[in-house]
Amino acid sequence: MIAGAKYGHTNLIAKDWKALARFYEEQFGCIPVPPERDFKGSDLERGTGIPGAELRGAHLRLPGHGAEGPTLEIFNYNILKEKPDVAVNRPGFGHIAFVVNDVPSAREAVLAAGGQAVGEVVTLTTAAGSKVTWVYVTDPEGNVIELQSWSK
C-alpha cells in the first residue's frame, strides 16, 4: 500500500470552466476553494505531455465532507480534444454521484439548469434489503451524474 494515500479530487475538463463550476455550486452546493488556477509554461507542458498547454480553472469542495474533504477540480485547457458520446458503460471513469433527498426533484433541477436526461428514475433493492432510488443525468457539458437516495 502507498503510505499516506488519501482521496484528493476528481477532475473534469470543461469547455467553459466558469459556467460548469457555477452549475455544480448552484445545483449541489459545492464551495469554491481559492485560488483559481492559471497555469502555463514548460513545467505544465512537461507534466501534461501537451506542447503549448495552458489551463485555467478552480477546485470546488464537495458537499458533506467538511472543510478538508475532497474537491471537484474543473479545468479548461487552451487545446481541447473532441468529447465522445455519453455512455455510462464506457471503460474508465463513468460518473460522479451525489446523494440527494428527492431524486425526481433533483433530476428536474438538473434538467432545468441545462443538464440532459440519460435514463429514468428507478429503485433497486440490494441483497441486504436496502433500497436505492437513482437516475443518471448529465451536467450542461455532458458529464454523467448519478443522483441517488438510499432507504431501508
Residue ranges and their predicted role:
Residues M1-A3, L12, P34-P35, H59, ...:
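Vicinal oxygen chelate
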Residues P63, F75-Y77, W150:
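Generic beta-structure capping elements
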Residues I2-G4, V88-N89:
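Short, flexible turn/loop "capping" segments at secondary-structure junctions
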Residues L72-N76, V86:
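Helix-adjacent hinge/juxtasegments
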Residues Y7-H9, P91-H95:
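Eukaryotic phosphotyrosine signaling hubs
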Residues I13-E68, A112, A128:
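Core segments of cupin and vicinal oxygen chelate
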Residues H59, I79-L80:
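Amide-forming acyltransferase catalytic core, primarily the GNAT-like/NAT-type
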Residues G41-R46, L80-D85, L124-T126:
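A short, acidic/glycine-rich surface segment
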